[in-house]
Design a protein with these regions (language model features):
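Sequence context of c-type cytochrome heme-c attachment sites
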Residues: 22-110, 114, 120-149, 169-192
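N-terminal secretory signal peptides that target proteins for export/translocation
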Residues: 1-7
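Generic low-complexity segments that are intrinsically disordered, proline-rich and/or Lys/Arg-biased
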Residues: 8-9, 188
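A contiguous, mid-protein "functional segment" used to position or interact
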Residues: 148-166
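Bacterial N-terminal signal peptides
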Residues: 10-20
């Protein structure tokens, strides 16, 4: 039991630390990726077909049974309420305004835009990043929670050896993942 608890505790503490750094102590609400879709439709469509967008589904009983068995997990168990899984399979779990459960916060199921780009409750509102304000300044939205530069530390909160699906010699290849991308990237229409 000790072996399982300590790594999971490190994951939770690490996530809280990085999220705390990205918001500089401010609390911003999570709004869900559907809000990002309004302005970033092509990116949203690209992301919605990724493993990250649909990663919550693997927590359901019977999903990826072979991989779960190989990892020492019970393939028949429902992991959709397991706190040690929700940290990396939902958006904002354990954070103020983050994922609570499927019924309460269905818009935060899966790894959404805000897991990488920060909780959007402030930066998608007036006077910041809105359809009415197409000339917002990037520095202004970064100051209110947008994470503009994705770092290896942010990714490694979940992509690490604490995952039951990788071995102890697993190394997350940030360069390859960044090159591959989580969603297609399209040029912005307006200068920021």
């Amino acid at each position: 039991m000790k072996r399982v608890f300590v790594p999971q505790l490190r994951i939770v503490v690490g996530i809280l630390f990085v999220v705390g750094l990205s918001t500089a102590g401010d609390e911003h609400a999570f709004v869900g990726s559907h809000k990002c879709r309004v302005c970033h439709l092509k990116e949203y469509k690209s992301w919605s077909e990724t493993k990250m967008a649909n990663v919550f589904d693997v927590l359901k009983p019977g999903e990826r049974a072979e991989e779960k068995t190989a990892a020492g997990l019970d393939p028949g168990k429902d992991y959709t309420t397991d706190p040690t899984c929700l940290t990396c399979h939902t958006t904002g779990y354990g954070e103020n305004g983050g994922f609570v459960d499927v019924e309460t916060t269905p818009k935060l199921v899966g790894v959404g835009c805000e897991m990488c780009h920060g909780a959007g409750g402030t930066y998608i509102e007036e006077p910041y990043m809105t359809l009415k304000n197409k000339s917002y300044k990037k520095d202004a939205v970064v100051a209110v929670g947008l994470v503009d530069t994705i770092t290896v530390a942010r990714c490694e909160l979940c992509h690490n050896t604490e995952s039951p699906f990788v071995g102890p010699d697993y190394v997350f290849d940030f360069g390859a993942r960044k090159e591959e991308g989580t969603h297609a990237k399209f040029p912005l229409k307006y200068e920021h």
